[in-house]
């Protein structure tokens, strides 16, 4: 969509759209590193003879550190908020992934990926805090655009690995394909983006640290009980999203007897619906309220998740992907903004939970669904477990309350 058309459809962001889009681009450049790692592991395993356990060990180094360290670094950002945390995080994340192609020892790779994970943890709380500030009175749209950058990173990471490391045959010519040394592309992209952001956020730093903008302003207060209820909504939503997207291609293959490429096509289609729903949900939240969007989405998911495993035709299941994407992706920015408002003294910590820990903890439901599918011999039957999880999220959404005014 052309930029002018986008601004016309969402005029509320016209004043700060350059800052929001730049932060979103930074989010993309940070998150593409974590999503590149699964695509990179087969090349590392083939080159160094790593077994599955070692590959899992390396994946754990990045994802677990990035998720679990974020709340602590969020608290640090609340105390000593500095704009340069944003480019520093991008640079560390890029270097952590980029160095793996030049290392031959799994322990050195582990250390490199830990550094990359810390970089991702440094980036997210401060970047989300800045996105909140520069969004002005339209935080729903602003945070949704910021989070869409993360969705873009999810799509771009494997593509860069395919081009830079694996290569794409075009007739008798192979485009890209520099082997493991192709991971230098991540270092190059990280240096470029970090340089741009370091130059730009310096100009925002003073505004972001004024008493009105700082998360720890004098009149701010924390509502931990409300944040706990919101965390219940967020954890169930992440559990549903990660589990459904993980098994969607396998579902198309196992239940509808489709090809692997068709299953992956459905996943791409669902992801596209998700990006559109994320943006639309942010605009809806600014107009009708964050709690209302979360509740609508929570209750919309109930009948769809209950019906989906009963559908026997792929075309009808494909149609259901659109409303399900709305139910799962539309409330995300609302949850991030509400979390920042509930913990208005510690927006960095709130962002660390909503963007880090919730993703990891929610993702733990995917193995449970897989275990049930193996035990019961049916992925369609196991999919029914998503409905009670959605009920828990809907109940939590009913108890969300308005943030306390500062």
Predicted regions, residues:
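Conserved MFS/SLC helix-loop-helix module at the cytosolic interface between two early adjacent transmembrane helices
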Residues: 68-106
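Residue-level signature of mid-helix packing/kink "hotspots" within the transmembrane helices
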Residues: 35, 63-71, 155, 271-279, ...
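Cytoplasmic helix-loop-helix junction between adjacent transmembrane helices
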Residues: 112-149
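Helix-loop-helix hairpin linking two adjacent transmembrane segments in secondary transporters
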Residues: 145-203
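Helix-to-loop junctions at the C-terminal end of transmembrane segments
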Residues: 69-81, 278-289, 373-374
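Extracytoplasmic gate region of multi-pass secondary transporters
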Residues: 37-38, 225-275
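Structural signature of the two symmetry-related core transmembrane helices
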Residues: 84-98, 292-307
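Interfacial helix-cap and linker-helix signal at transmembrane-aqueous boundaries
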Residues: 44-45, 76-77, 160-169, 174-175, ...
């Amino acid at each position: 969509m052309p930029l002018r058309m986008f601004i016309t459809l969402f005029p509320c962001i016209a004043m700060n759209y350059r800052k929001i889009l730049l932060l979103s681009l930074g989010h993309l450049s940070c998150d593409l590193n974590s999503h590149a790692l699964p695509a990179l592991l087969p090349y590392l395993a083939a080159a160094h003879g790593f077994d599955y356990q070692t590959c899992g060990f390396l994946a754990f180094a990045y994802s677990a550190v990035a998720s679990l360290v974020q709340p602590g670094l969020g608290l640090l950002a609340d105390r000593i908020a500095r704009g340069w945390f944003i480019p520093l995080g991008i640079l560390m994340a890029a270097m952590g992934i980029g160095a793996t192609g030049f290392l031959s020892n799994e322990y050195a790779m582990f250390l490199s990926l830990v550094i990359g994970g810390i970089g991702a943890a440094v980036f997210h709380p401060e970047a989300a805090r800045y996105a909140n500030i520069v969004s002005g009175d339209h935080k729903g749209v602003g945070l949704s655009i910021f989070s869409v950058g993360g969705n873009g990173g999810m799509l771009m990471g494997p593509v860069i690995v395919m081009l830079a490391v694996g290569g794409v045959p075009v007739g008798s010519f192979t485009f890209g394909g520099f082997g493991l040394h192709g991971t230098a592309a991540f270092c190059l992209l990280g240096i470029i983006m970090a340089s741009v952001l370091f130059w730009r956020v310096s100009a925002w730093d003073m505004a972001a640290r004024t008493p009105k903008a700082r998360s720890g302003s004098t009149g701010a207060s924390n509502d931990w009980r409300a944040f706990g209820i919101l965390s219940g909504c967020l954890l169930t939503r992440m559990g549903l999203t990660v589990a459904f997207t993980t098994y969607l291609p396998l579902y198309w293959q196992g239940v509808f007897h489709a090809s692997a490429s068709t299953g992956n096509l459905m996943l791409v289609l669902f992801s596209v619906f998700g990006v559109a729903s994320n943006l639309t949900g942010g605009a809806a939240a600014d107009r009708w309220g964050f709690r209302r969007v979360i509740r609508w989405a929570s209750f919309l998911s109930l009948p769809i998740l209950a019906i989906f495993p009963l559908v026997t035709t792929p075309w009808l299941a494909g149609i259901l992907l659109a409303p399900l994407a709305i139910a799962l992706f539309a409330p995300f920015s609302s949850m991030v903004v509400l979390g920042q408002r509930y913990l208005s003294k510690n927006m960095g910590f709130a962002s660390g939970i909503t963007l880090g820990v919730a993703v990891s903890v929610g993702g733990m439901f995917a193995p449970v669904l897989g275990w049930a599918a193996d035990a019961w011999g049916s992925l369609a039957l196991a999919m029914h477990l998503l409905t009670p999880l959605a009920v828990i999220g809907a109940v939590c959404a009913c108890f969300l309350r308005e943030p306390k005014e500062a």
